[in-house]
UniProtKB/Swiss-Prot annotation:
Any one Gene Ontology molecular-function term assigned to this protein's record: quinone binding
Subcellular location: Plastid, Chloroplast thylakoid membrane
Protein name per the record: NAD(P)H-quinone oxidoreductase subunit 4L, chloroplastic
Membrane association type: Multi-pass membrane protein
Species, as recorded: Psilotum nudum
Any one Gene Ontology BP term: photosynthesis, light reaction
Biological role: NDH shuttles electrons from NAD(P)H:plastoquinone, via FMN and iron-sulfur (Fe-S) centers, to quinones in the photosynthetic chain and possibly in a chloroplast respiratory chain. The immediate electron acceptor for the enzyme in this species is believed to be plastoquinone. Couples the redox reaction to proton translocation, and thus conserves the redox energy in a proton gradient.
Enzyme Commission number(s) of this protein: 7.1.1.-
Subunit structure: NDH is composed of at least 16 different subunits, 5 of which are encoded in the nucleus.
Pfam families: Oxidored_q2
Length: 106
């Protein structure tokens, strides 16, 4: 059974849009750096859902959307590892991971 036959296009695009909006809202309103990283991952997953959806509905002969998703997942994993390492370093130095207390220009 193909993925395209299970869900309607509108449902998957709506799911991707909701996840993107929730992640973006969380990204711009979060005060915690770890929460901001999690919201950024949610935004990237919404983009992945849209890539796979468009690939399955409009480009059934090729797997270009899935290849883009693999690249995005690899970049997201590296981004999460580097981001968490930066957060850990900032916590060791400042004893806080709140974004409003974080200013390297001092």
């Amino acid at each position: 059974m193909k993925f395209a036959n299970i869900f309607a296009l509108e449902h998957l695009l709506t799911l991707g849009a909701y996840l993107f909006c929730i992640g973006f809202y969380g990204l711009i309103t979060s005060q915690n750096m770890i929460k901001a990283l999690m919201c950024l991952e949610l935004v990237l997953n919404a983009v992945n859902i849209n890539f796979v959806t468009f690939s399955n509905y409009f480009d059934t002969q090729h797997i270009k959307g899935e290849i883009f998703v693999l690249f995005i997942m690899a970049i997201a994993a590296a981004e999460a590892a580097i981001g968490l390492a930066i957060v850990l370093t900032i916590y060791r130095d400042r004893k806080s991971i709140r974004i409003d207390q974080f200013n390297l220009l001092k």
